[in-house]
């Protein structure tokens, strides 16, 4: 079983790399009414309308620079700009991490061809990728073997997403299925369902999950209430909250923070605060996210 999970995890990483290479070869829209964003290999980004193209270059009509000619060999990516990405006249690039909060998922999935790498506190590592617009798969590891440890947690995170009403109501069903490599009978994880109300960048999410260890499942579910609100092109507020049934009573874990959304990297920073106890305790969260791939849009 462990070898199968390890092989599947490695296979996913190879598939991500192959899809990343394939995604770099993109079709150039021929419709001059379609607004696009062009990223170039020297790190620049241009938005506007393609008015002409030749085998060697693309002519883009921009609002601030007029018409510019961009050599095709310098084009790293071309993405169509959707109307919901124009906010108060400003182009907001996609937030590919909007399918989750600090750690917990919501009802949205990654778009086909879209992926990212997540690292939290150095040890936690996960890669997620959109196989289709409705199916996302992830693989993660805490590489304790690098620190003379033999027991290494590894996991898979499949998720199926169903848009009930596009950009307004989304359902997600999935799980985190893990083992500890180097230990016997070490399987554990959680199976969950998520209901997300609102678009990807501004929503509230209600979740219900049942955890398990080995063959034993929890008697009662864990409840999650989370949300995000993107306040600008480069920043979003986030909260992720849990209610655990610990037997005698419920344990509540609250969190609050934000996501700094760069074009090529994003930083998650926040505090997790247990609601019980007389003393105030706050555990910091720090994560780094790096996108890859190029999603396909309608």
Q: Which residues fall in each region the model found?
A:
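Compositionally biased alpha-helical segments
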Residues: 24-116, 121-123
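Short, surface-exposed connector motifs at secondary-structure boundaries
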Residues: 106-111, 134-135, 234-237, 265
